[in-house]
Structure formats: C-alpha cells, structure tokens
C-alpha cells in the first residue's frame, strides 16, 4: 500500500467536495496516507515484491471499481484460483488497513472536536456541557430534579461477540499506535522518551504484521471474559470515575439542596460468563471465573493505586497536623514503619487490609499486596471509609490539591466498582426453567407433572412454594444433568453475591418470557440456592428478576404480564423490598429477526408506552434494559439519538443497554473515546428524563396510528420473504457465511439455540452478521420501502398529502427520525452488486433469482422512499462524518468480500485445507473490523 492519492480519498457526495470540506479532512487523509505507506513498506519488506504488487494491484483495482472504471466481474476474476498463500497476506493487509483506518478516523474526530472548542463554538449535542445548559435553561426546581433522579442509573452492559475477539497483543499494539498518532496529530516528531514517532509507528506496524490476528483454537468463554475486562485498565477505571464525579458535582452545584446522585449514576455491567441462554458452556465454574476475574481486576487496580499514592503522599508530621481519625488509622501500622510520615503509614494499613481481603476472596493474588497481619475489609464501604478519612485529613491541613487528584479518583472508583467491578447478569431461557422446576417439583413430591398444568394452576402452585422457606431438594437428590447444572450455576451466583457483595449479580434475566409462571419459575430456582426468601413480611431478594420480551408477540403482551405479576402480593412485596424498582428487558434482535426492522422498532416503542403506563398505575419505578446489538438490525445506532427517541416516561433517570461486538472497541478502548460515549449516554438520559423531547405533543395519537399501519405492512412484507418464500433458508445459508460460523469455531456458543434449520432458532448475532458480511444488511431495512409505498397509496387522501404526513413526522418526531436515519446508515453500507456475487454461491439458479430479485427490488424501493420522505438526495446527507468514512474505507473492503466469496466456494467444494479455513476467518474479522458495527 503505497501513498494513497487524494482523489481516492475524496469524501462522498457533492455537498462535501467543497474546499472547506477538503481542508477539514486533509489531516485525516494525511494520517491514512502515512499509515498506508508504512503498512505497504512492511508488506514489501516481510513478504517480498510479488505479494506487495498483488496487494497494491488489489488496492488500485478497488478504487477503479469505486470510480466505475472497471466492473466487479473484472475484479472478481483477479482472485479466481489465487494461490491461498498469496490470498492470506492480501486479506491480512486489507484487514490491518481497516484497523489502521479506524485509528485515523478516531484521531480525526478528536482533532475536530478540539478545533470546535478552541474556536469558541457552542458545545455540541450529546456533550454533558450542552446538556447542563439545556437543564439550566429549563429552570427546574430542586424537588423535581431530586424526584426524577431518585435511583438514577446508566449502565452499559458488555456482552460477548464472536467477531470482537482480538488477542491482547493486537489490542495493546493498536492502543500504542493510537497514542503515537495522537502525538503526531499534536505536531510532535518524538515520543516523551525521545523515540522518533514514525520509527516507532513502523515498529508497531511490524509487530502487528508478524502477530496472528486470530487464535488457533475455538474461542473459550475464558477468552471472552479476558476481552471484556481489558477495557477497565485501558479506559473505564479512569473515565467512569471522572465522569461520575463531574456529573454529581455539576448537578449539586446547580441544585445544592437536592442531595442528588448519592450513588454513582454510571455503573457498568456484564453478561460474559453469566449468559447461558443456549450456551451449555456457561457452567458453575465459568460463573466463578467471571465473578472472580472481575473482582481480581478491581482489587488489582486499587492496590496499584494505593502503592502509587504512598509515593505521592510523603508529608511529614513535623510540617503538618493530621486529624485524629487519620492518626488512629496510621497507628494501626506495625511499629517502626515511617514514624513521621502518617499518610504513608495509613496507606500501608489500607493496603495491608485490602491485601488480606484479596487473600480471603480471590483464588489468585494481584501485584502490590502487602502482608501485615491486619484484618480484611468486610465490605467495600469499609475501604471507602478509610479513604475518606485520608481525604478529610488532607483537606484539613490545606492539601486539597493532592486529595483531589489520584486519591479522589480512587475513592470514586471504590464507590463505583466495589469489590465486584461490574454486575454480572445471569440469563437463561424460560423453557429450561420450566423443565428444571418441573423436575424439582416431581422429585419433592409436590406435583408429578408440572408441565401439564394450566397457567393459573402453575401460578398458584409456584406462589405457594415461594411462600414457604422449605427447599424442594436436599443433598443427595437424584437429578438430571440439566437440573444439576442449573442449580450449580445459581449456587455459584449466590457465592458471588455473598463473597463480593450484592452488586456482583444484580439481575436474573428470563429469555423468551411468555407468562407469569415463567417469572415465578425463576424465583423458585433463586429460592433453592438461598437468593430469595419471600416467606417473611420483609422478603430477601438481592437479585432482581427481569423478564425479557423479545418477539413481536411478547412485546405486545409484556405490559399485561408485568401487571399480572404486580397483582400478586408475594411478587409485589419482592419488588418493594428492592426499592420499588422493576427492570424489564426489551429485545431488539429477536424481534427484528421475527418481524423485520420497522415492525420490531415500533413494537418496542409500543411496549415501552404500555409498560410505562403499567408502572404509573401500580406505583413502581420502571427501569428498561435495552438489548441492543452493534448493528441497526439489532437495535444499534447512535446512542444519544436512540435514547432521545424513547417514548415519554421510558427513561426516568435509569437506563441499561447492552454493548457488544466491534462497538465495544470503537467506544471504550481509549479514554477519550470512552469519555465521549459515556457522556453521550448520560447526556441523553438526563435530557430524556428532565426535558420534553418527544416533539409530538397533542398529535401523538394520530402519529402512533400511522406507525401502527406502516409497521403492520412492513411486517407483512418481511414475512413474505423470510418466513414464506420457499427455499429462503437454503438461500440464506448458501449466500452468506452463516454455515461457516459454527464450522470454523467462531465464538464460544452455538449459532442456534436448538439444533434445527429454523430461522426462529438461529441466534440473532449470526443472522445479522451473515447478512452484514455479504453486504446485504437485510435486517436493517427490509420491508420498510414496501410498507411506506403501500401506505401512501392506501388512504382516501392524496398520495402527496400522505407523504406530507410522513415528512412532518420525520421533522418533528425523534423516534421516527432516528429509525429512518439508522436505516439510511445501514443502506449506505450495503452493496447489492457485491451481494449479487454472494448469491452466485446458491446452486439453484431459480431459487437464487427468486430471492435475490426480491431483495434487490425492495432495496431500490426503500432507498427511493427514504429520499421522498426526508427530502434528501443522499442517504448520508445528514451524516457527513459517516459519508466520509464510507467513501474512504469501503474500497478497502472490496478485496475482502471478493476473496471471501472465492474461499467460501473452495471450502464448500471440499477444499478444507487449514489455510482456506483461516482465510475465511480472516476475511470475517477484517470485514467486521472495517464495518465497525457488523453484528
């Protein structure tokens, strides 16, 4: 990859081809040229001229395709019959370039923000500064804001993903390249230790090139746990602590008498090691590993910070006077240790006690432990109290500047992360609960055939069981492997709660929750392991029970199920014992796979409206947990706009949402990126809670009626293709790499919940990822164009009048605008010409034409309808940053797609050479990295 020409990097769309636009993006294009040249030099040096020329030819041809100088068929012929040993370095080169282009784009976004701030421009939406200005302008009183933010929580929940599996070495090398490019952007030519930046960049790119991108063996859950935890030392320890403190201080300064945010608002969560829905690899041992590794990460951070603090707080008792509380703390230090340095002695005590805690609760000991024979901390609150003592003493003798630095960050970290780091949610499918509870009831002689009971009988029986403290089983019970496994997993969760604190396992989520009995079955299982006791007037339940409504039908029925649960005095008492808050999870992925993009998004919106009304009537606080994937087809998209697009009352100070896939690295790998994205979540949550953002007012009812009609039409169009077209499953499996996901050891869990060929049983991640790899992006748009077209033609009004209705909704309603904007982003990343190449993998020509023609027609129809409704000529007219990214990045995807098709063809024809398999895996990872939100 030699120096890339400017014309090859010119932003898409005439609106961006202005002199100002080119000047604004020139630094980014220069960074891409620099990194591309270094990568090209590395390829030539390491693999020789022949491989370099192949890579360079592929790059040039890709841009010729972009500029319509050659057609796709000519480029495809370039790779026909290519030697696999030449194909692999080409794939690696373009995969690495995608990674390096990500770095350049991220640096450029930071650069542009700095320029805007330096120019004195108003703070941009999604920043906390802009949000504070809006809140101040609204002139909210203290009582209003205090009530609205009671129990406030914003929780990004990290989940595993098959394509976000970069090895630690790759992760750390990319981090180092980002640091170097940041220095380069600031005008430096050398690092702090005198190394030349370009030389060091070459060193890091060489390390990348000589390091395997993917693991040799199937990803284990232990690998996924490590991937999820790496973001804490990289960024989250620092940024979450800072942002929590800043938000609390800013709001309290404006409303000093409101006592706001007594607990940290920003608290992370995790599913990695607790999500066993369809994943038999999540065992009791895995739960212990996940919770223990998280605790290890937290305590290791605290011990390292305490060690650093001891170096900084060197004050002498001859020069300052400490508080009596600090003196008492320091006196617990063994005699002879730094007698005139009270803070160092106090910190030794804290470090010694925390080391004793680590020895008591961890299987492996972190660095910086100190054996002093002191008692361990029973809770993180005890540790925090000692740190508060140090803080108060420092402020007392005028050392506030020192107290407000590292010590302040550590105190905030302990408030947020405790001994548990992040809450591990447990999740299992309701079918498994039914089977296990039925077995336990039969073994205990309560009922021989629980599954034969009607719903009302089940509820009565389960409520009776929950009203007694008696367990169903005792030691020595003869149970099936499934029942033993489920109870073992829950026992491990109970151990985590009792060892690391109740925040270690905050929620038990029920997948495919269809009824009240589904929730009560989970409660019975929690009771069996000691995590629930409803037999007394004050129930005990440290773990919340959260239903997950994830199909279109379940979303429609969710509010009725919640109402029925809250009508049960026993369950209502459990909710009251947990502060009167009930969490409900909404699934975007399975609802999308079930009914298509528009129908799923509208079903979620309608479900939220109904759940909010149920919460209002019953007097509980509702917390919604959004099961969003990285892609629009799984509920993804810009978080700020997505949160503002929620219906009135749906946020109410609390929000949880899943973060997964390449999105995690894009958001949280670097402190600057992490801060920006966490600020965005907080800003939107505060605005949605405290300001009127829906924009519909009295016109909500007719707007909802329009979407009811359009969503029904969209679901019908989607069903005709996905559920009713003969041979569709065969087409999907042949025209995408979905079949290879399982065969090539991608991810730690099966691609389907059950061993069937059904789309319904296929997991949402492989469903979306497969369409993404083949560049169809079908889950993010299919059915929408037909629905709008039919709706325009269906009413008594003229088509022009009905089009104006849709245009007005787009202008005024954040939800509708967000849905269309996210769809446009997906369609801008789709490429039907490349998709046609994948369709050639379908052997049955009649089937191929039948399905692909439907997809192509709907694609054209959807783009046309988007442009008519919005009045825009370009899919990305309102998102110039993404337009630049698509134009700059996507020519480099071209060779990866063509090579993936070529290697899939070989693999399926019986050429199962290890190199062919590895090549397919590399193309998958390269495309996922380049698309940044592929699954």
From Swiss-Prot:
SUPFAM superfamilies: Phosphoenolpyruvate/pyruvate domain (SSF51621). PROSITE patterns: PEPCASE_1 (PS00781), PEPCASE_2 (PS00393). GO terms for molecular function: magnesium ion binding; phosphoenolpyruvate carboxylase activity. One of its GO terms (cellular component) is cytosol. The active site is at residues 161, 593. Keywords: Carbon dioxide fixation, Lyase, Magnesium. Its EC number is 4.1.1.31. The keyword Transport does not apply. Coiled coil: none annotated. The keyword Glycoprotein does not apply. GO terms for biological process: carbon fixation; oxaloacetate metabolic process; tricarboxylic acid cycle. Its cofactor is Mg(2+). It is an enzyme of class 4 (lyase). Forms oxaloacetate, a four-carbon dicarboxylic acid source for the tricarboxylic acid cycle. Belongs to the PEPCase type 1 family. HAMAP family: PEPcase_type1 (MF_00595). This is Phosphoenolpyruvate carboxylase.
């Amino acid at each position: 990859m030699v120096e890339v020409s400017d014309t090859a990097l010119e932003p898409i769309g005439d609106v961006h081809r202005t002199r100002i636009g080119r000047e604004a993006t020139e630094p980014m294009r220069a960074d891409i040229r620099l990194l591309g040249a270094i990568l090209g030099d590395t390829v030539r040096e390491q693999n020789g001229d022949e491989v370099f020329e192949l890579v360079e030819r592929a790059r040039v041809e890709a841009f010729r395709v972009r500029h319509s100088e050659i057609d796709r068929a000519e480029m495809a012929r370039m790779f026909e019959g290519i030697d696999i040993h030449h194909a692999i370095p080409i794939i690696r080169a373009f995969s690495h370039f995608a990674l390096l282009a990500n770095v350049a784009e991220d640096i450029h976004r930071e650069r542009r923000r700095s320029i805007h701030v330096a120019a004195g421009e108003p703070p941009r939406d999604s920043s906390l500064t802009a949000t504070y200005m809006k809140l101040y302008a609204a002139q909210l009183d203290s009582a209003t804001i205090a009530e609205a933010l009671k129990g406030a929580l914003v929780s990004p929940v990290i989940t595993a993903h098959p394509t976000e599996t970069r090895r630690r070495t790759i992760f750390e090398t990319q981090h180092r390249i980002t640091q170097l490019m940041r220095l380069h952007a600031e005008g430096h030519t050398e690092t702090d230790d005198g190394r030349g930046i370009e030389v060091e960049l070459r060193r890091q790119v060489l390390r990348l090139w000589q390091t395997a991108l993917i693991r040799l063996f199937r990803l284990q859950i232990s690998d996924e746990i490590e991937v999820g935890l790496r973001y804490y030392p990289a960024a989250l320890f620092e940024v979450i602590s800072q942002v929590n403190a800043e938000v609390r201080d800013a709001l309290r300064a404006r409303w000093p008498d409101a006592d706001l945010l007594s607990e940290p608002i920003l608290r992370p969560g995790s599913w990695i090691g607790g999500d066993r829905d369809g994943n038999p690899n999540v065992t009791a041992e895995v739960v212990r590993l996940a919770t223990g590794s998280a605790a290890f990460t937290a305590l290791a951070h605290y011990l390292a910070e305490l060690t650093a603090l001891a170096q900084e707080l060197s004050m002498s008792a001859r020069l300052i006077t400490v508080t009596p509380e600090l003196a008492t703390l320091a006196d617990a230090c063994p005699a002879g240790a730094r007698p005139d340095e009270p803070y160092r002695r106090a910190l030794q005590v804290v470090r010694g006690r925390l080391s004793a805690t680590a020895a008591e609760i961890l299987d492996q000991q972190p660095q910086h432990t100190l054996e002093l024979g002191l008692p361990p901390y029973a809770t993180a609150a005890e540790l925090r109290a000692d740190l508060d003592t140090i803080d108060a003493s420092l402020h007392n003798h005028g050392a506030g500047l020192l107290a407000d630095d590292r010590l302040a960050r550590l105190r905030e970290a302990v408030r947020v992360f405790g001994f548990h780091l992040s809450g591990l949610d447990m999740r299992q499918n309701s079918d498994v609960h039914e089977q296990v509870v039925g077995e336990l009831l039969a073994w205990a002689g309560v009922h021989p055939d629980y599954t034969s009971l009607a719903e009302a009988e089940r509820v009565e029986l389960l409520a009776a069981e929950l009203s007694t403290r008696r367990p169903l089983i005792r030691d020595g019970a003869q149970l099936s492997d499934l029942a033993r496994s489920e109870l073992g997993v829950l026992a491990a969760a109970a151990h985590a709660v009792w060892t690391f604190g109740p925040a270690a396992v905050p929620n038990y989520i029920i997948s495919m929750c269809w009824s009240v009995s589904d929730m009560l079955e989970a409660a019975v299982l929690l009771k069996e392991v000691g995590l629930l006791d409803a037999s007394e007037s004050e129930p005990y339940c440290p773990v919340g029970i959260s239903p997950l409504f994830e199909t279109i039908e379940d979303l429609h029925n969710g509010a009725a199920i919640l109402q029925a649960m809250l009508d049960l005095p026993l369950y209502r008492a459990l909710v009251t014992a947990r502060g009167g808050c009930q969490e409900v999870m909404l699934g975007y992925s399975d609802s999308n796979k079930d009914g298509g993009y528009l129908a799923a998004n509208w079903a979620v919106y309608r479900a939220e409206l109904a759940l909010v009304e149920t919460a209002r009537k019953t007097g509980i606080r509702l917390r919604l947990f959004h099961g969003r994937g990285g892609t629009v087809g799984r509920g993804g998209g810009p978080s700020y706009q997505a949160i503002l697009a929620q219906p009135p009352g749906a946020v109410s100070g609390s929000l949880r949402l899943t973060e997964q896939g390449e999105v995690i690295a894009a958001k949280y790998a670097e402190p600057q990126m992490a801060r920006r994205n966490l600020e965005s979540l907080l800003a939107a949550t505060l605005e949605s809670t405290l300001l009127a953002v829906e924009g519909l007012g009295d016109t909500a009812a007719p707007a909802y009626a329009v979407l009811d009609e359009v969503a029904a039409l969209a679901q019908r169009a989607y069903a005709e293709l996905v559920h009713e077209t003969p041979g569709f499953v065969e087409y999907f499996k042949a025209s995408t790499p979905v079949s290879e996901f399982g065969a090539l050891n991608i991810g730690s869990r099966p691609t389907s919940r059950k061993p069937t060929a059904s789309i319904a049983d296929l997991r949402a991640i492989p469903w979306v990822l497969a369409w993404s790899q083949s560049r169809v992006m079908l889950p993010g748009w299919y059915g929408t164009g037909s629905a709008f077209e039919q709706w325009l033609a269906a009413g008594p009004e003229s088509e022009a009048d009905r089009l104006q209705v849709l245009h007005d909704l787009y202008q005024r309603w954040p939800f509708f605008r967000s849905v269309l904007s996210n769809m446009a982003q997906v369609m801008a990343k789709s490429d039907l010409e490349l998709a046609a190449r994948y369709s050639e993998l379908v052997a049955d020509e009649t089937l191929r034409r039948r399905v692909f023609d439907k997809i192509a027609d709907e694609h054209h129809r959807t783009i046309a309808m988007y442009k008519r409704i919005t009045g825009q000529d370009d899919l990305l007219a309102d998102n110039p940053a993404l337009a630049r990214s698509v134009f700059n990045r996507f020519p480099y995807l071209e060779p990866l797609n063509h090579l993936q098709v070529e290697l899939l063809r070989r693999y399926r024809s019986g050429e199962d050479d290890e190199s062919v398999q590895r090549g397919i895996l590399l193309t998958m990872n390269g495309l996922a990295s380049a698309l940044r939100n592929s699954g």
